[in-house]
Swiss-Prot record:
It comes from the Bacteria. Heme c 2 binds at residues 202, 205-206. Keywords: Cell membrane, Electron transport, Heme, Iron, Membrane, Metal-binding, Transport. InterPro entries: Cyt_c-like_dom (IPR009056), Cyt_c-like_dom_sf (IPR036909), Cytochrome_c-type_DH (IPR051459). This is Diheme cytochrome c-type. Binds 2 heme c groups covalently per subunit. It comes from Cereibacter sphaeroides (strain ATCC 17023 / DSM 158 / JCM 6121 / CCUG 31486 / LMG 2827 / NBRC 12203 / NCIMB 8253 / ATH 2.4.1.). It is found in: Cell membrane. PROSITE patterns: CYTC.
Amino acid sequence: MRRSLTAGLALVLIAGAAGLWLTRPVKSDPELFAGLTGEASRGERIFWAGGCASCHAAPDASGEARLVLSGGERLTTDFGTFVVPNISPDPDHGIGGWTVADLDSALRHGTSPERSHYYPSFPYTSYAHVEPQDVADLKAFLDTLPPSDRADEPHDLAFPFNQRIILGGWKLLAGGPSWIVEGDLAPEEERGRYLVEGLGHCGECHTPRNGLGLRDKSRWLAGGPNPEGRGTIPNITPAKLDWSAGDIAEYLSSGFTPDYDSAGGQMADVVRNTSQLPDEDRRAIAAYLKRVPAIE
């Protein structure tokens, strides 16, 4: 009996240790960036494609003030309220002291410099696709922006969601980066996939989620309840979005639909970002969206 109990306890300990190892916060290897030099001019393109200002600018900021990434926006969800952090280059209150590898750890692994899990209100499951050179370029651009000394505020989450240790299990369930739309894609469509599935993180809102907040990838971009709890997000697969590729590209540039309506709500902010992109990126997004499987 004693040997059975000892063996059982050993198995429990081994299983627990394995679970902790599998769900540990993962950081990027600094060697990944050896020989890479970030260029701010390229990083600005990554900045707008990634929609950084949409969350990290101060609430209601406009114009040049959107480049002060002081945070403070409150995201209300079924899990509680998340307060967006300061990612300005301030060394004390922002990310001015981060290395490129620190930024990559956050973007692609959802891990802080202190090796703790970030909540997936930060869309690192999409940013996991971002290329190392783009991370280096983004860091170079972020370092040129105005600093803010606004201190971060804690999230307002109820138990058990206020326990970051559970996020390792959530990440394990979410899986690693894999492309949704595969097959023989033209270079323009591949670029669009990178922008939509990766940097632009369109699936974070336009794809429905289950009770754990995991995206239902079988209904990719088919719309669903707003993750922030207000209204619904539309289906942008070809089953519902019947615009031409040119119409889509124009909407991402001007915000005007083929029916001369205009983008509103959260999409108005998205268009403020996509309007800063070069024409070829907007055309690439449109080309990709025409290749997405139609889902009713």
